[in-house]
Amino acid sequence: MGVKKLSRKDYLNILESILFIDFLKGLSVTLKNLLRRPITTEYPKEKLTPPKRFRGAHGHYVWDGTEPDSLKAIEKFMSYEKAKSRCVACYMCQTACPMPTLFRIEAVQLPNGKKKVVRFDMNLLNCLFCGLCVDACPVGCLTMTDIFELANYSRRNEVLRMEDLEKFAIDFKQRRGNEPDRIWPNDEEREKLWGKIEWSG
């Protein structure tokens, strides 16, 4: 049996093993990022504004005169009041939801034959925040706001009533209603997280 000759590639592999070349390559990445500004936000002292399309707490849009004219036909079979929820108790949100136990919707028939929603509860402990209920709503009543601080000490407080949902939507519409629909609220906040983006040409 003859002596095996080592090729140039084998010599380089041995040299890399002795000098820890791969280790130094990995360490260079670490050292390069060590000098960069961290992207972490010191929550709760510092808070970022979520984008308008953020999937936070749900809200109920109310009858305020800004709804489309096509919804005026609802007057024939629904009893509604100004500044109250647009919900028509069609149960489409509950049907579309992967967790239908999340909703508790009740409506009553009034003496004049019209229907009135008396209860709309959402148990956020069951919610996946997928937004399927918002897409399914035929009257554009349901929306998702930018409210994300929903932690509570009691399970009972995780159930949102219709009044809570109305307040969330009114507040969201006043704060962000005229804002353009963008992924990031502004370039400053995006740069704070990811640095200045330079396009390669």
Swiss-Prot record:
Topology versus the membrane: Peripheral membrane protein
Domain 4Fe-4S ferredoxin-type: 78-107, 116-147
Family: Belongs to the complex I 23 kDa subunit family.
Known cofactor(s): [4Fe-4S] cluster
Any single Pfam family the record assigns to this protein: Fer4_7
Name listed for the protein in its UniProt record: NADH-quinone oxidoreductase subunit I
Organism listed in the record: Aquifex aeolicus (strain VF5)
Cell location: Cell inner membrane
Entry note: cofactor: Binds 2 [4Fe-4S] clusters per subunit.
Keywords: 4Fe-4S, Cell inner membrane, Cell membrane, Iron, Iron-sulfur, Membrane, Metal-binding, NAD, Quinone, Repeat, Translocase, Ubiquinone
Purpose: NDH-1 shuttles electrons from NADH, via FMN and iron-sulfur (Fe-S) centers, to quinones in the respiratory chain. The immediate electron acceptor for the enzyme in this species is believed to be ubiquinone. Couples the redox reaction to proton translocation (for every two electrons transferred, four hydrogen ions are translocated across the cytoplasmic membrane), and thus conserves the redox energy in a proton gradient.
InterPro entries: 4Fe4S_Fe-S-bd (IPR017896), 4Fe4S_Fe_S_CS (IPR017900), NADH_quinone_OxRdtase_chainI (IPR010226)
Residues reported in the UniProt entry to bind [4Fe-4S] cluster 2: C97, C127, C130, C133
SUPFAM superfamilies: alpha-helical ferredoxin
Swiss-Prot/TrEMBL catalytic activity: a quinone + NADH + 5 H(+)(in) = a quinol + NAD(+) + 4 H(+)(out)
Residues that bind [4Fe-4S] cluster 1: C87, C90, C93, C137
Description of how the protein assembles with itself and partners: NDH-1 is composed of 14 different subunits. Subunits NuoA, H, J, K, L, M, N constitute the membrane sector of the complex.
